[in-house]
Amino acid sequence: MVMIETFLGMAKYLSPREDDDWSDRLNYLMTPNILLAFSVLISFKQFGGRPIECMFPNKFPGSWEQYAENYCWSQDTYFVEPTQDVSLLKKEERYTPDRQLSYYQWVPFFLLLQAAFFRAPSYLWKYFSNHSGIRIHEVVEKAKDSANVEEEVREKNILILKRHLSSALRFQANMERKKVQVHKTVTFLNFQYSSGFISWIYLFTKVLYFLNVFAQLYLMNYFLGTNRHHWYGFGVVQDIVQGEPWERSGYFPRAAVCDFEVRQVANIQRYSVQCVLVINIFNEKIFVLLWFWYVILLLSSTVSLVQWFIVLVFPCFSKWFVKQHLALSTLQNFNQRNSRREDSDVSKFVTQYLHKDGVFVLRMVSSHAGIIFATDLVQALYEAYDFQDKNKDVQGSPVSDDLQTISTGAESSIRQRKTRKGSRIEYKAGFPISTSLMPDKDDIESSSTSSEEDQKRVSNVITNI
């Protein structure tokens, strides 16, 4: 029961995220799972079976055979073609890089290391995206809510996302406009408060995926010691097409030679025995498959990196994306295509309100939740921007700010007085309820005095301006 709970707890780390694309999932989800499966398969054969079997002289007792096989497995073997005489090879000629076989013991650990490297960029993206003001993972999850088929739930979720995104985008814009430096010493940490933080971090994650796949191809060639071909997979396919067997190619040889010594009384006997590497039957198939899978990953990562670089770096693609969604919305201003006013409004909406991160989040929502939900969200954000833009002159003036503060304070004081007054109301018998709720003389005088004070404050503000 405990093992099942542990497995279910680990399953969430193997599940896909909602803030990525198809190329990311190939890198951080599918590839590590494939590598883990291969690592477990090889481990079962190594530690649960006989990965190597050697041929010994008849005089060897059973204990010697077990010792020799364990020794040859833990030490390096070397490859010799069937036509060569082992006795004619010098010791330094036997363990040259072209002949020495030292990788097969480490295959499970090498595969686990590769899985960790493929998974690492996703953790980097998860960490930094959670430290930004926009919770993109939660935004996409809310957009993908299956309950959005109901109109009320859909409108509620759009309202929640609009408020969250508007608040986060407004905060980022204020930080950049006021040039607030939260971190005085390490200034580059202030980058997380910029309006392009998530976009650049995601693009950096794409670069890491690309570099990782390229590095894994190189490390595989280095690990297997394939010096004859710089591109291992193509070399193996070429040998197979040309009909060259493993006895001459040396790639994952089934048979190898092992040298070991046995101490007998005062003498040391040296033996060279031929061993069958059964494990290489699995290794050959696994690494050929992985090599071509990595080539596919390299191509997909390149395409995805170029695609996101173009749409994030060049503003014209952001404006085109938003304009297409606004054209699909119910807004009357965008029924006419290619109008100058429409282009101007979209340009201001993208550059002054959404910025780079806002468009990036909308792209993720459109990719995961569909174009219909994304269009409704774009429309809601544009309506919020349009309302803010129309009231910018009134809200941004010093007079209106002070007047708004005074009005708010006056309304608050009136509400407080009404609350105190309500506690003193006496319901008199024989009088209508409306008569008993009328304010008394003291309240009228207090209210008039407060109104006179508010008018004086407004006059002082206007005079100072």
From Swiss-Prot:
The chain crosses the membrane at residues 29-49, 105-125, 195-215, 286-306. GO terms for cellular component: gap junction; plasma membrane. It is a multi-pass membrane protein. It is found in: Cell membrane; Cell junction, Gap junction. Residues 433-465 are annotated as: Disordered. It holds the Pfam family Innexin. Its main location: membrane. PROSITE patterns: PANNEXIN. Keywords: Cell junction, Cell membrane, Gap junction, Ion channel, Ion transport, Membrane, Transmembrane, Transmembrane helix, Transport. GO terms for molecular function: gap junction channel activity; gap junction hemi-channel activity. GO terms for biological process: monoatomic ion transmembrane transport. Belongs to the pannexin family. Structural component of the gap junctions. PANTHER family: INNEXIN, INNEXIN-11. This is Innexin-11.
